């Protein structure tokens, strides 16, 4: 039976703005309070989805969240009609309104951790929504994330869904941005690679000093248990705390893996040799041949990696076994990074081609190609059980671009977030979107 890696990309929501909400994310902080263009952001994301679909890759779409999140503001003490809640928040606590309007759910690499059926004890695909408890604006995402994933992957014969881990710092979980799976074939048992920034309970592990480590070892271990993964199929590694302090807030900013290949920066991990040996040994026992490509700091610095998002790329396997790297335009703008990529593809190695995409609206908030997608490895029968409304096709692309053109503003500033009309625009758009994607009622305004 054939198996596929399906990339489900996050559709950018109508309230995409530069709120500067993500401490430790250099791009998010440095572009704070600039004017944004939600329409352009959504169309840039859709263009990437269409391009991958046309290249022959399986591509899906993940719906955005309801924003402003009026229920979240009510939980913080604002009362009255929805319009009054928004106006009160704007007057009394603008940062809370900005947080409740964040379109950060577009970065669906943080939506959940996914384990394919070949790895799990019960032979189903397992999903655990990430609690994202490190940042308030993201911690409010997981209830809707769970409902959307449940509507996309509804068949309980094939799919199992777990609630987010306890929303406390000890179980800080950032989802697939700190998780990669290595395998010989997507349908065969593989090795799941969990990367953490600190341990909550074991003081022997070092931690960053400047920026927070968002993923704990204990959270990764809990997800592996929930998914029924075997010890032989799991490797845990610690991200280098010094790179977290340089703006590497998720592992997908400093490494990317796919199939049998890990592409990583020399400074990405602690105890790298031990980690590589464990990956090689465990994948070898599952019939795979683990290979790694290390980018030396002498050629690309950590700062270059963070500015260009070289590693926040998509590493994709072509039918002929060669690999393709999808990178943001910013890689071409960095001389050292671009020079490295040219030498990489001309060396006759595993990565043969680089494709560049303009994702500037997302990049200015600190999210590149890898942030925008959630990978789900599916067997043919499982893919057939996915809600067909969320699988990208040429007609769906056309419908979604028209939908964006109809509902999205082309300019949004912080003061616009206080406009109650924006809430109505967003709800109207999302109500239509759930019909387009055949999701049913998943948003609070549709349920309550």
Swiss-Prot record:
Transmembrane segments: none annotated. Its EC number is 3.5.3.23. The active site is at residues 174, 250, 371. The keyword Transmembrane does not apply. It catalyses: N(2)-succinyl-L-arginine + 2 H2O + 2 H(+) = N(2)-succinyl-L-ornithine + 2 NH4(+) + CO2. The keyword Disulfide bond does not apply. It is an enzyme of class 3 (hydrolase). Pathway: Amino-acid degradation; L-arginine degradation via AST pathway; L-glutamate and succinate from L-arginine: step 2/5. GO terms for molecular function: N-succinylarginine dihydrolase activity. One of its GO terms (biological process) is arginine catabolic process to succinate. It comes from the Bacteria. InterPro entries: AstB_sf, SuccinylArg_d-Hdrlase_AstB. Substrate binds at residues 19-28, 110, 137-138, 214, 252, 365. Coiled coil: none annotated. Keywords: Arginine metabolism, Hydrolase. Pfam families: AstB (PF04996). Belongs to the succinylarginine dihydrolase family. Catalyzes the hydrolysis of N(2)-succinylarginine into N(2)-succinylornithine, ammonia and CO(2). Homodimer. This is N-succinylarginine dihydrolase. It comes from Pseudomonas fluorescens (strain ATCC BAA-477 / NRRL B-23932 / Pf-5). The gene is astB.
